[in-house]
């Protein structure tokens, strides 16, 4: 989808350096966090006793001060701080991603960065299913 991390890397390759995007906050409102490896649902039961930050090497306020278990608790009791911290984290992740894209473009190492990022980034099951349906519909269209 538009505005997702993998897509940002692709448009960065085309020289796009600035754009508006509501995805980080929209996804946060659905209790989901972006990471360098894909998305995670903070409300999922497996986070109930996960005392780690959303992403270990993230320097955002949410990751430096809150665990997934505590964020999950905040979301489950409808405390607005939970959604705010997910928005902070997701926005930070996107800014960091764009910073890395610019850095690698400037250093001439973007192709390697893009390859490594895409190889390590796993989209959600929903995205994978949408891609499969899209590929099937394109195959059907081309065979007619």
Tell me the role of every PLM-derived stretch.
Residues 57-144:
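C-terminal extensions of enzymes
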Residues 1-54:
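Glycine-rich phosphate/ribose-binding loops and adjacent secondary-structure elements
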């Amino acid at each position: 989808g538009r505005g997702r991390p993998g897509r940002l890397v692709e448009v960065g390759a085309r020289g796009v350096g600035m754009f508006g995007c509501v995805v980080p906050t929209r996804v946060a409102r659905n209790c989901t966090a972006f990471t360098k490896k894909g998305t995670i649902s903070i409300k999922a039961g497996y986070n109930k006793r996960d005392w780690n930050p959303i992403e270990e090497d993230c320097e955002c306020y949410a990751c430096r001060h809150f665990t997934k278990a505590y964020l999950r608790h905040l979301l489950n009791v409808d405390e607005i701080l939970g959604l705010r911290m997910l928005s902070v984290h997701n926005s930070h992740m996107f800014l960091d991603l764009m910073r890395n894209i610019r850095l690698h473009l400037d250093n001439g190492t973007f192709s390697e960065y893009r390859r490594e990022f895409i190889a390590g980034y796993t989209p959600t099951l929903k995205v994978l299913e949408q891609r499969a349906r899209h590929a099937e519909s394109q195959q059907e269209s081309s065979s007619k």
